[in-house]
């Protein structure tokens, strides 16, 4: 008798995606990050659902409702900090996942890669709107500054900003709609994840060597399920340590002050995972130029498949490209540090240099190095 998981219409889909899926035997632990992202999304949706039961999206009560969750709701503090720090873990996994895609040439599956970029924008939008909900000082001023960037769009900018705000400033209408979208978007993200996997399973996973692996496959279960469970346990351990020992490590102390439109914080900055893009935005003195650079810092990922000039798919056997890749990682860490610093000398010039380096490495140096490595193969 055939196993039910291979015959049942619904179980068959799950079986082909999670049990009997053939995976290249050389796939390393770097490929764990996709599974970890699914776990992060599940944690965020569950904790967010329970937080939404106690949260009120009204400017008069939002800050107090978050305080009430932490003080009076059973394990409310755990829910709140799991959700806040879970977002940080989400972005750590997300950036590792993108980095691994760049390193191993996964962007050659352009449909999967492009859906991934849409997912990145959706997750960033969700995280931004979530940061506004506690209605602290940084929530209010962050929302004001970031939404105000849209006013740089010619002709329609100002009207667009007021349409998003639902008035002439960030107020009750803004908070209510941000809460509605923050609740809705994770489910849209979950649907996009299914599409992402659908496109991935059309082609099958690539592998670190970059050569066809059809003759050398292993079933997903038990080999990769065990590996992924280990990764999830490691991530949950890290998240638990963060939540239980230093829950405010990655937050901003200004967000414990209720939002006050009459008092501007000395240094407005977003959450740490947006600081690299914020640094690129600030490095250009022109408003429209800064906004374009901000958007392009993410959209540049979409042109990476077009700039692939190497005869090899992955960077595994390309040491010069590897050096450039790690230089890009170091550059992003520098930008993240600069984004959290005040706008003064020497941070301004460091930020500008790091921003130029970011685009130069991706758009110029990587394709040029790949072409040089092609010539080296002839020696």
Curated annotation (Swiss-Prot):
Residues annotated as binding heme b b562: 83, 182
A cellular component annotation (GO) from this entry: mitochondrial inner membrane
Topological type in the membrane: Multi-pass membrane protein
Primary location: mitochondrion
A Pfam match: Cytochrom_B_C
Keywords: Electron transport, Heme, Iron, Membrane, Metal-binding, Mitochondrion, Mitochondrion inner membrane, Respiratory chain, Transmembrane, Transmembrane helix, Transport, Ubiquinone
Residue numbers binding a ubiquinone: 201
Cofactor: heme b
InterPro entries hit by this protein: Cyt_b/b6_C, Cyt_b/b6_C_sf, Cyt_b/b6_N, Cytb/b6-like_sf, Cytochrome_b, Cytochrome_b_C_euk/bac, Cytochrome_b_N_euk/bac, Di-haem_cyt_TM
Family recorded in the similarity comment: Belongs to the cytochrome b family.
Subunit structure: The cytochrome bc1 complex contains 11 subunits: 3 respiratory subunits (MT-CYB, CYC1 and UQCRFS1), 2 core proteins (UQCRC1 and UQCRC2) and 6 low-molecular weight proteins (UQCRH/QCR6, UQCRB/QCR7, UQCRQ/QCR8, UQCR10/QCR9, UQCR11/QCR10 and a cleavage product of UQCRFS1). This cytochrome bc1 complex then forms a dimer.
Extra remark beyond the main annotation: Heme 1 (or BL or b562) is low-potential and absorbs at about 562 nm, and heme 2 (or BH or b566) is high-potential and absorbs at about 566 nm.
Name used for this protein in its record: Cytochrome b
UniProt organism field: Pteronotus rubiginosus
Organism taxonomic ancestry: Eukaryota, Metazoa, Chordata, Craniata, Vertebrata
């Amino acid at each position: 008798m055939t196993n039910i998981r291979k015959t049942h219409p619904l179980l068959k889909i799950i079986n082909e995606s999670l049990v009997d899926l053939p995976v290249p035997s050389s796939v390393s632990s770097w490929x764990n990050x996709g599974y970890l992202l699914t776990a992060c999304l599940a944690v965020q949706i569950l904790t967010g659902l329970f937080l939404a039961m106690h949260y009120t999206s009204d400017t008069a009560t939002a800050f107090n409702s978050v305080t009430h969750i932490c003080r009076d709701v059973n394990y409310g503090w755990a829910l709140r900090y799991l959700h806040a720090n879970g977002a940080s873990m989400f972005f750590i996994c997300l950036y590792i996942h993108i980095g691994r895609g760049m390193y191993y040439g996964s962007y050659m599956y352009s449909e999967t890669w492009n859906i991934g970029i849409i997912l990145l924008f959706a997750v960033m939008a969700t995280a931004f709107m979530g940061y506004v909900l506690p209605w602290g000082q940084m929530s209010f001023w962050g929302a004001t500054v970031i939404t105000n960037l849209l006013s740089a769009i010619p002709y329609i900018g100002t009207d667009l900003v007021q349409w998003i705000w639902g008035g002439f400033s960030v107020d009750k209408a803004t908070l209510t709609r941000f809460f509605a979208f923050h609740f809705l978007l994770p489910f849209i993200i979950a649907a996009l994840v299914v599409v992402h996997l659908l496109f991935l399973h059309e082609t099958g996973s690539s592998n670190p060597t970059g050569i066809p692996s059809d003759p050398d496959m292993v079933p997903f279960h038990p080999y990769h399920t065990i590996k992924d469970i280990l990764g999830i346990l490691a991530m949950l351990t890290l998240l638990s340590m963060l939540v239980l020992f230093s829950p405010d490590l990655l937050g901003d102390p200004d967000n414990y002050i209720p939002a006050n439109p009459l008092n501007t914080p000395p240094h407005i900055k977003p959450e740490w995972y947006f600081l690299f893009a914020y640094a690129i935005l600030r490095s250009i003195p022109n408003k429209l130029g800064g906004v374009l650079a901000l958007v392009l810092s993410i959209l540049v990922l979409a042109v990476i498949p077009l700039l692939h000039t190497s005869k090899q798919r992955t960077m595994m056997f390309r040491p010069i490209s590897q050096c450039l890749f790690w230089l890009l990682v170091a550059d992003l860490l520098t930008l993240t540090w600069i984004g959290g610093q005040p706008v003064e000398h020497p941070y301004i010039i460091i930020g500008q240099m790091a921003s130029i380096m970011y685009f130069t490495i991706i758009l110029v140096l990587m394709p040029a190095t790949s072409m040089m490595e092609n010539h080296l193969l002839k020696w």
